[in-house]
């Protein structure tokens, strides 16, 4: 199965300068849109959104004409997909919630282009620490209970390039997640165990263009 769509998002970041070039940074990202589903039939315009929050600590290191800033921290990602309704083949959909706690490890490279502009590149690896998947199968109206699974294997990658001039910034980004198969949980129908269910391995690729204002 696959889901594809377009989102609009908002990023907020704040940085506090500490001693000896160290810094503390907080990030908050919200993205909202809709996706088209292909799998057990097709369905279009399913609401889909996520929110991501992180706390990072790092240190700036001047090297020649550039600044390298390695960092690490703790992040949380929540994704919601509303697939309720009937697909083109008559399959019933349901809501899904993904919860990830992860360890971000990355490095920022900053290079001055002139007195007013600089190029900033960021490369990050995200190690999944804990994940929980909630499948609200009761939405399908077939007597099934909701399913809760844990996902503890996976990783993410983030790459971005920003051209900054004065207080403005613009540039492309790519985000990727690869999450392993979950554990199995007992599946109930009308309160009676009828089998087991799990969340299959999945991956997410997100790319786009970011524009920002610093103040």
Where are these regions (language model features)?
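Transmembrane beta-strands of outer-membrane beta-barrel proteins
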Residues: 22-28, 53, 66-74, 103-105, ...
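Transmembrane beta-strands of outer-membrane beta-barrel pores
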Residues: 28-36, 74-82, 111, 123-131, ...
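Residues that define the transmembrane beta-barrel architecture of outer-membrane proteins
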Residues: 2-10, 32, 45-53, 66, ...
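Predominantly the C-terminal beta-signal and adjacent terminal strand-loop region
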Residues: 121, 147-215
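Short glycine/proline- and aromatic-enriched beta-strand/turn motifs that initiate or cap beta-hairpins
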Residues: 1-39, 206, 212-214
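Extracellular loop and loop/strand-boundary signature of outer-membrane beta-barrel proteins
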Residues: 1-2, 35-46, 87-96, 133-151, ...
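Outer-membrane pore/translocation modules
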Residues: 33-106, 196
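Outer-membrane beta-barrel channels and translocator barrels
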Residues: 15-21, 60-65, 112-116, 164-168
């Amino acid at each position: 199965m696959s889901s594809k769509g377009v989102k609009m998002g908002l990023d907020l970041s704040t940085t506090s300068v500490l001693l000896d070039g160290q810094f503390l940074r907080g990030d908050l990202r919200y993205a909202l849109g809709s996706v088209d589903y292909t799998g057990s039939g097709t369905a279009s315009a399913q609401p889909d959104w996520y929110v991501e929050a992180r706390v990072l600590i790092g240190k700036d290191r001047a090297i020649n004409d550039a600044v390298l800033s390695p960092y690490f921290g703790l992040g949380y990602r929540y994704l919601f997909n509303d697939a309720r309704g009937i697909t083109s083949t008559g399959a019933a959909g349901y809501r899904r919630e993904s919860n990830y706690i992860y360890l971000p490890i990355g490095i920022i490279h900053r290079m001055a282009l002139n007195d007013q502009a600089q190029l900033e590149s960021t490369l990050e690896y995200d190690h999944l620490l804990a994940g929980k998947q909630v499948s609200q199968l009761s939405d399908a109206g077939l007597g099934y209970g909701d399913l809760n699974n844990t996902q503890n294997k996976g990783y993410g990658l983030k790459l971005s390039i920003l051209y900054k001039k004065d207080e403005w910034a613009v540039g492309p980004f790519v985000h990727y997640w690869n999450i392993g198969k979950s554990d199995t949980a007992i599946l109930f129908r009308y309160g009676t165990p009828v089998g087991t269910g799990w969340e299959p391995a999945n991956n997410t690729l997100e790319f786009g263009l970011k524009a920002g204002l610093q103040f």
